[in-house]
Amino acid sequence: MTLPSGHPKSRLIKKFTALGPYIREGQCEDNRFFFDCLAVCVNVKPAPEKREFWGWWMELEAQEKRFTYRYQFGLFDKEGNWTAVPINETEVVERLEYTLREFHEKLRDLLISMELTLEPSDDFNDEPVKLSA
């Protein structure tokens, strides 16, 4: 499948995978890509498959000459679902912001190398962390 930008989707998936453990291929559809990061374990006592994590997820949409994004901070529960919830621990928020900025920078640089831009979605008004320079 070729995206509106003219790039084959399979090649983009390969490049996105090389950015790190972020892309969830099974949740990517058509010209939309899904990334997430399980940044901070809520409690290490449960068995690994039953742990919950604080983290973020990002939806990326391919358009003609750009990719647009929207993201959320929240909880990845033991069933494997994301829920947007307020996070009150300063250290956790700082870690989420750091990992999101790091990923955003790598993603932006990759897209620039392909002569594409990365911008917030037109309807993404609630950007808790400013990412674009």
Curated annotation (Swiss-Prot):
Gene3D superfamilies: Sigma factor-binding protein Crl monomer. Keywords: Activator, Coiled coil, Cytoplasm, Transcription, Transcription regulation. It comes from the Bacteria. Signal peptide: none annotated. One of its GO terms (cellular component) is cytoplasm. Residues 90-111 form a coiled coil. It is found in: Cytoplasm. Pfam families: Crl. The keyword Translocase does not apply. Residues 99-122 are annotated as: Essential for activity. Binds to the sigma-S subunit of RNA polymerase, activating expression of sigma-S-regulated genes. Stimulates RNA polymerase holoenzyme formation and may bind to several other sigma factors, such as sigma-70 and sigma-32. Belongs to the Crl family. This is Sigma factor-binding protein Crl. GO terms for biological process: positive regulation of DNA-templated transcription.
